[in-house]
């Protein structure tokens, strides 16, 4: 099947609350890399109070926000937790960044109290003294090139044996000790990497698009568009 006959629908969850680190850049990257291939793409934004129908979505983005905003979002999402869980277990594609990453797990324990998580992945996060702030480079088996970004988080996330997004080559990662960053569960990626993540790492964007198309249409041959500018920017970050 020609990719020009395909369509991807991206759900951006709560951009009114979870857009602390420019997560709309991740949406823009996904859209562009679909359009460059002739794949029809649309983004639907779901803000507080909106009804979310996961059956109509191919990729879901959960961005980052403050602890207060995370608590508001989680309270809303817990009302449809079973639908979100079904989407994940059925292979639905999710990219969750920073606060969104923390919401995937069982809980986020902060100095102010406990934020209940969505329990979509068996992980948990606890706030500890000091923030982990630096450039970061990962070796991820999902893509061929190093994954680069910037991390800035006070929470330490523990994976309970789940697969990490990547091995830390430079930076702190999930907890500053394990040597790993992020989590991968089925077609879910959770990560602390900002940048935004996807414009800095177009291969990760293509991985998400590939998984979404395969879930919807079966086997797909995705030909990656080559962008010299993107590759040079990526190589510069990886060399830091």
Pin down the residues of each PLM region.
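N-terminal beta1-alpha1 cap of cysteine-dependent amidohydrolase-like domains
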Residues: 1-89, 199-232
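C-terminal and late-domain segments of enzyme folds
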Residues: 2-3, 146-147, 156-232
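Conserved beta-strand scaffold positions in the cores of enzyme catalytic domains, especially
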Residues: 43-45, 120, 149, 188-190
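Structural motif
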Residues: 59-63, 95, 192
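Cysteine-nucleophile active-site neighborhood
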Residues: 67-140, 144
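Short, structured patches in soluble enzyme cores that scaffold and shape functional sites
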Residues: 122-125, 149-154
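Single conserved hydrophobic/aromatic residue that forms the stacking wall/gate
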Residues: 230-240
């Amino acid at each position: 099947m020609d990719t020009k006959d395909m369509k991807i629908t991206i759900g951006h969850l709560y951009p009114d609350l979870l857009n602390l680190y420019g997560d709309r850049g991740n949406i823009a990257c996904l859209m562009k890399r679909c359009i460059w291939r002739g794949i029809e793409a649309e983004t639907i934004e779901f803000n507080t109070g909106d009804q979310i129908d996961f059956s109509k979505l191919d990729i879901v983005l959960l961005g980052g926000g403050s602890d207060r905003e995370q608590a508001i979002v989680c309270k809303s999402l817990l009302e449809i937790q079973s639908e979100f869980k079904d989407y994940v277990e059925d292979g639905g594609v999710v990219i969750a960044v920073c606060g969104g990453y923390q919401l995937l797990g069982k809980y986020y324990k902060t100095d102010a109290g406990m934020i209940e998580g969505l329990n979509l992945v068996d992980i948990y996060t606890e706030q500890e003294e000091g923030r982990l702030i630096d450039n970061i480079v990962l070796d991820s088996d999902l893509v061929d090139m190093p994954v680069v970004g910037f991390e800035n988080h006070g929470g330490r996330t523990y994976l309970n044996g789940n697969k990490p997004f990547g091995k830390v080559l430079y930076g702190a990662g999930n907890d500053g000790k394990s040597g790993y960053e992020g989590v991968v569960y089925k077609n879910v990626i959770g990560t602390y990497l900002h940048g935004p993540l996807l414009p800095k790492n177009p291969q990760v964007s293509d991985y998400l698009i590939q998984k979404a198309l395969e879930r919807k249409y079966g086997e797909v041959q995705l030909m990656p568009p080559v962008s010299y500018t993107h590759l040079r920017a990526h190589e510069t970050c990886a060399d830091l």
